Amino acid sequence: MALSSPSGGVRRARQLLHVSVLAQSASPCGRFLAAANDFGEIAIFGLSAALSAEAKEENRRAVAVVRAHNGPVYSLASTERLLLSGSDGEIRAWSWAELGRKGCRELWTRRPPCRSSLEVPEINGLEVNQRHELRGHQDLVHVVALREQLPQVLSGGEDGTVRLWDLRTGAQVQLIEVHKYQECSRPQLGKWIRCLATESDWMVCGGGPALTLWHLRSGTPTTVFGLAQPQHHALFHQDLVLSGGVGPALHLLQLSGDVRGKVPVTPAALRSLCLHPRSPEHQVLTVAGNSPKIDVFTNLGYRAFSLSFT
């Protein structure tokens, strides 16, 4: 007897068992959240509706899901009009005004230059400031971060370095070989840099090396955070560093190195943290990773509810 193929609903249910949400980006108005997964999809959530006191379960599901790329969507970034998505060897632009409508298509596709037909880069990080092609890393670049109020960008990669670039000239102006500093080196985990954030003269980065706070002007580590597991994403928030990585926890870290809190989350590992400063209702943080659920925090001490990537 021939076996019939599973229906679309069954196939989707199986797919959701293996979904990882790799990237998030808030809409310019603060009312929506875009989240991207490893099956090439971008989901749009009505964040304002989900935060409403009258919210129902359906308000916490995606209002639209767009098949954006053939491969995983590794990164998202927003402008005042556009949502940019990065996948294997390509960047696509989408109109925020059209994303929730049926039949939405990308506005354009760009393919960064490659040195050979065999080199198809993963677009792991996006920042909206296209001026130069910056070359210097010896391996994959995992993350980039623009410095506020300065024409500079930081990049971290598989080669264990963080590099500071001048966007006026495209020149590298500083090199920090993170894995060579004994304070934060963890050779048993590797030298790769996966997370990177900057604020004023400070930087926090980690991955194989321990998550560490650095003073950029002097190029020296000042605080090594005592987290045993590799961290995948970190950001500054008020007087804290927020981070997530291997393990189902959001870490709240004081700049002194003390752990202010370790908050349980739904994903088995975190890959993306997203602050929503323009959210009209609350100060909101969303966290995502190895799960179809995206946890929403309106208070850093506990999860308020979860959005569902279905």
Specify the residue positions occupied by each region the protein language model found:
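Inter-blade linker and blade-boundary elements of WD-repeat/beta-propeller domains
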Residues: 2-17, 49-70, 98-142, 171-195, ...
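WD40-repeat beta-propellers
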Residues: 42-47, 91-97, 127, 144, ...
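Loop/turn-rich, solvent-exposed surfaces of beta-rich toroidal or solenoidal domains
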Residues: 199-213, 222-256
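Blade-level signature of beta-propeller repeat domains, shared across WD40, Kelch, NHL, RCC1
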Residues: 278-310
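Beta-strand-rich domains and repeat architectures in extracellular enzymes and scaffolds
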Residues: 14-40
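Loop/turn segments within WD40 beta-propeller blades
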Residues: 24-30, 70, 75-81, 125-128, ...
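Aromatic-anchored, glycine/proline-accented short structural segments
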Residues: 155-215
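Conserved strand-to-loop turn within each blade of WD40 beta-propeller repeats
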Residues: 29, 36-39, 47, 85-90, ...
